[in-house]
Amino acid sequence: MTGGGASARRKRALEALEQVGLGGRVDHRPSQLSGGQKQRVAIARAILNNPRILMADEPTGNLDSATTTEILGLFSALHRAGQTVILVTHENDVAAHCQRVVRLFDGRILSDLPAEQDDEVAPHVPAARAMGAAA
């Protein structure tokens, strides 16, 4: 984390932990956190300095469904605020939260479509959009 004094850095860190639902766990050691909580700490670290581009590789893999919804809502909010968010996932219901779906196989692009036009993702889009609106 760069910029500002120690108190400013701590404040930004606390805000990032709050955004991922871990504000109450700030004094816990890594060994006291579950796998999903560690995943959320990693997400908090990634958003801490407000990057223009956020690349998240399977960001919801260790999360329960409720926390997955919260984190995808956070990513949607970051995107609405002007950040580019790139999600790597094997889950069609997670991909449905995205604007575009790029399918790869052995490093080659098979398709690049709006989520609504991707046959495997499109059935999940209405529910994903409804969850995003609620988040």
Question: Can you say where each PLM-predicted feature lies in the sequence?
Answer:
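Conserved ABC ATPase signature
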Residues: 29-33, 37-39
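Catalytic Walker B motif of ABC-type/P-loop ATPase nucleotide-binding domains
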Residues: 54-57
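Conserved catalytic loops of ABC-family nucleotide-binding domains
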Residues: 74-87, 95
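Helix N-cap at the start of a conserved alpha-helix in ABC-type nucleotide-binding domains
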Residues: 65-67
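Conserved ABC ATPase "signature" region
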Residues: 6-24
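Conserved catalytic motifs of ABC-family nucleotide-binding domains
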Residues: 50
